């Protein structure tokens, strides 16, 4: 028997339906569905994960920093509200014992490879190298059967290792830096306020803050524009002065005076026709930008909808950077199927009449997946939500446009001379629809048709007007523009960028759905980190590690090398942070707490009792290397008395002693009080 592991339950159902030579048998174990199917004389069990079944967590339970000693644990232990994953882990564990072979059929990307790798290693208890790999970009029967017939001999260890490295680095950065910020505020104010930053989150917030500063520091400058209002065949037209901005009011007045004294005539007419090729196939970033422009969808919403369309089998895998379609894709069959939908029939029939179907393609490639395309599976009534219908329509129309003829646009520029001054009258129109006939609803072209002019023609001037304007600050980023900026900077991935933006909203660092404004909290976090530990928010450092994770994928670096380098780098950053922890905490606490005094005071140590050896104070200390807390004598290094202590909970002195004079303390954690002697040899332990 063979166990096929899908990423999600609905995908497992699709795979079972595609591979089964007869109707799949649906069964459940621990309430989790799985399928028994027969293919090529073999019995298959098709089961699923439910996204990530395993996450990273510290091996020891303490809230200090830095912490690098982490391990993979079930996701319901690593994260809150993930109890639903428990039964899926149990199901895979039991089913794995029934089979001899394994096939990973998760999404073919770094996250899918990590899901498959960890499910095999920890839930199934087998060496991941034993598993074969189904590789597909669409959940149609033909794609899944093709993946079955062309199984990869192993999972893609390059992608798996790169994905594991990314998870570890994100954990190192996110958890350690967030703990550092939280500890800093606690030290300065005595209050627990959780702040977060991350490996990509920080640099992203930084460029948003930089734009906010540009806007805040912007000083508008006055300028003047001059317009010439003319009449032609009863139609009023407005021509613009050859200089788009005049910085002197006196100069503007002079021009107006001179124009009023002059006769106006047409001095030149320039007509150009330009072919506009169809837009290239959708990669995820372009789809997110177009959907934002057309529907106002956030990048996260677009990705979620595109993922749903993929899982329903109507479009291909969305997390791609490719602008190229598969060479073996049956374009004619897909278009024939699309022609069954009335809204696309005229365009599909036009294409089906062509002897050859050759799509326009872009330059970008993705080794894992092609550009996004409709699979040819046709949605039935009620299959799609309203938002899914919108995005599906955009994807289908874009696909059809790829095969159509270029559009032709005509631009006309009429130059009007009034004395020594030139004014420009511009018009533009579409003279051949081409691909615009199918995709024009998502492309905004100005259509301005001018009446016919002749060179030397006298022009009737109705008005010459001078308008005062002011320069405007740079525009704030839209959500779609943030994704584009992250792409340009080389930070984040196609799969993570939208979620990083959502995290910044959730943390209260930014606000505004269409025009993103950084909040005072977001401004203060970046201002403080820039001042004391600028490397935390370095775009260059983040981009460098992104490049190294690509090298892991290519097999040119090992994950261990990159993880160790990251650990060394982050340790240095955190050492610098600890030196300035109180100052950082004071700056941040003023905005998140509000009642912190300006003077810097050293935090009073917690005294738990007297040293039985020298009579000094026994105080709570922190190991500079590990961040772990312990109890030690205030007279160190003259006195070397130390005691270990639990790493979680509030420490409350009791003024009592126990074994050999060791103090007794109360550890208060999650509403529970535990009274303990600090001597680990005490029988009460």
From Swiss-Prot:
One of its GO terms (cellular component) is chromosome. A zinc finger (C4-type) spans 611-639, 658-682. GO terms for molecular function: DNA binding; DNA topoisomerase type I (single strand cut, ATP-independent) activity; zinc ion binding. InterPro entries: Topo_IA (IPR000380), Topo_IA_2 (IPR003601), Topo_IA_AS (IPR023406), Topo_IA_cen (IPR013497), Topo_IA_cen_sub1 (IPR013824), Topo_IA_cen_sub2 (IPR013825), Topo_IA_cen_sub3 (IPR013826), Topo_IA_core_domain (IPR023405). It holds the Pfam family Toprim. Residues 1-141 form the Toprim domain. Residues 196-201 are annotated as: Interaction with DNA. The keyword Transport does not apply. PROSITE patterns: TOPO_IA_1 (PS00396), TOPO_IA_2 (PS52039), TOPRIM (PS50880). It is an enzyme of class 5 (isomerase). Residues 156-574 form the Topo IA-type catalytic domain. Keywords: DNA-binding, Isomerase, Magnesium, Metal-binding, Repeat, Topoisomerase, Zinc, Zinc-finger. Gene3D superfamilies: 3.40.50.140, Bacterial Topoisomerase I, domain 1, Topoisomerase I, domain 2, Topoisomerase I, domain 3, Topoisomerase I, domain 4. The active site is at 317 (o-(5'-phospho-dna)-tyrosine intermediate). It catalyses: ATP-independent breakage of single-stranded DNA, followed by passage and rejoining. Its cofactor is Mg(2+). The record marks 52, 166, 170, 319, 507 as: Interaction with DNA. Its EC number is 5.6.2.1. Mg(2+) binds at residues 7, 107. GO terms for biological process: DNA recombination; DNA repair; DNA topological change. Monomer. Releases the supercoiling and torsional tension of DNA, which is introduced during the DNA replication and transcription, by transiently cleaving and rejoining one strand of the DNA duplex. Introduces a single-strand break via transesterification at a target site in duplex DNA. The scissile phosphodiester is attacked by the catalytic tyrosine of the enzyme, resulting in the formation of a DNA-(5'-phosphotyrosyl)-enzyme intermediate and the expulsion of a 3'-OH DNA strand. The free DNA strand then undergoes passage around the unbroken strand, thus removing DNA supercoils. Belongs to the type IA topoisomerase family. This is DNA topoisomerase 1. It comes from Pyrococcus abyssi (strain GE5 / Orsay).
């Amino acid at each position: 028997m063979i166990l096929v592991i899908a990423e999600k339950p609905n995908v497992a159902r699709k795979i079972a339906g595609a591979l089964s030579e007869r109707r799949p048998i649906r069964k459940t174990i621990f309430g989790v569905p799985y399928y028994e199917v027969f293919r090529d004389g073999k019995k298959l069990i098709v089961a699923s994960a439910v996204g990530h079944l395993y996450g990273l967590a510290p091996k020891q339970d303490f809230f200090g920093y830095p912490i690098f000693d982490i391990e993979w644990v079930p996701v319901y232990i690593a994260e809150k509200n993930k109890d639903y994953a428990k039964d899926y882990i149990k199901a895979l564990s039991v089913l794995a014992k029934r089979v001899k072979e394994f096939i990973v059929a998760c999404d073919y990307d770094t996250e899918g490879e990590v899901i498959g790798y960890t499910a095999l290693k920890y839930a199934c208890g087998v060496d991941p190298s034993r598993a074969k790999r189904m590789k597909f970009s669409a959940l149609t029967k033909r794609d899944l059967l093709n993946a079955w017939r062309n199984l990869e001999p192993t999972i893609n260890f390059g992608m798996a290792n790169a994905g594991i490295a990314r998870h570890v680095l994100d954990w190192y950065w996110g958890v350690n830096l967030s703990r550092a910020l939280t500890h800093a505020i606690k030290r300065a104010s005595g209050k627990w306020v959780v702040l977060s930053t991350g490996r990509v989150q920080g640099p992203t917030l930084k460029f948003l803050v930089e734009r906010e500063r540009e806007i805040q520091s912007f000083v508008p400058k006055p300028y003047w524009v001059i317009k010439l209002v003319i009449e032609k065949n009863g139609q009023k037209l407005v021509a613009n002065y050859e200089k788009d901005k005049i910085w002197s009011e006196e100069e503007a007045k002079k021009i107006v005076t001179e124009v009023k004294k002059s006769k106006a005539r047409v001095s030149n007419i320039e007509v150009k026709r330009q072919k506009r090729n169809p837009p290239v196939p959708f990669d995820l970033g372009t789809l997110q930008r177009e959907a934002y422009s057309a529907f106002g969808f956030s990048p996260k919403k677009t990705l979620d909808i595109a993922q749903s369309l993929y899982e329903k089998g109507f479009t291909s895998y969305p997390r791609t950077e490719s602008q190229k379609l598969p060479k073996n894709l049956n374009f004619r069959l897909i278009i024939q199927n699309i022609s069954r939908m009335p809204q696309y029939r005229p365009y599909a029939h036009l294409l089906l009449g062509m002897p050859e179907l050759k799509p326009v393609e872009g330059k970008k490639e993705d080794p894992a997946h092609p550009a996004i395309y409709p699979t040819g599976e046709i949605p039935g009534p009620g299959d799609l939500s309203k938002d899914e219908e919108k995005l599906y329509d955009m994807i289908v129309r874009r696909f059809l446009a790829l095969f159509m003829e270029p559009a032709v646009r005509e631009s006309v520029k009429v130059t009007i001379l009034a004395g020594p001054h030139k004014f420009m009258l511009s018009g533009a129109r579409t003279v051949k629809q081409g691909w615009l006939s199918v995709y024009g609803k998502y492309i905004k072209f100005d259509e301005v048709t001018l009446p016919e002019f002749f060179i030397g023609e006298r022009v009737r001037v109705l008005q010459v007007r001078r308008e005062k304007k002011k320069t405007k600050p740079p525009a704030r980023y839209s959500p779609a523009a943030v994704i584009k900026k992250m792409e340009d900077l080389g930070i984040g991935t196609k799969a993570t960028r939208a979620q990083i933006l959502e995290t910044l909203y959730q943390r209260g660092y930014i606000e505004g759905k269409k025009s993103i404004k950084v909040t005072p909290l977001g401004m203060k976090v970046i201002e403080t980190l820039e001042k004391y530990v600028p490397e935390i928010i370095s775009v260059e450092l983040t981009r460098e590690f992104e490049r190294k994770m690509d090298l892991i994928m290519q097999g040119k670096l090992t994950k261990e090398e990159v993880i160790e380098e990251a650990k060394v780098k982050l340790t240095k950053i955190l050492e610098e942070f600890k030196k300035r922890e109180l100052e950082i905490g004071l700056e941040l606490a003023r905005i998140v707490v509000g009642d912190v005094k300006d003077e810097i005071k050293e935090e009073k140590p917690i005294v738990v009792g007297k040293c039985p050896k020298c009579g000094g104070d026994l105080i709570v200390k922190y190991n500079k290397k590990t961040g772990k807390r312990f109890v030690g004598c205030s007279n160190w290094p003259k006195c070397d008395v130390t005691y270990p202590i639990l790493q979680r909970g509030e420490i409350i002195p009791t003024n009592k002693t126990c074994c050999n004079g060791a103090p007794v303390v109360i550890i208060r954690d999650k509403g529970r009080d535990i009274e303990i002697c600090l001597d680990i040899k005490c029988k009460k332990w």
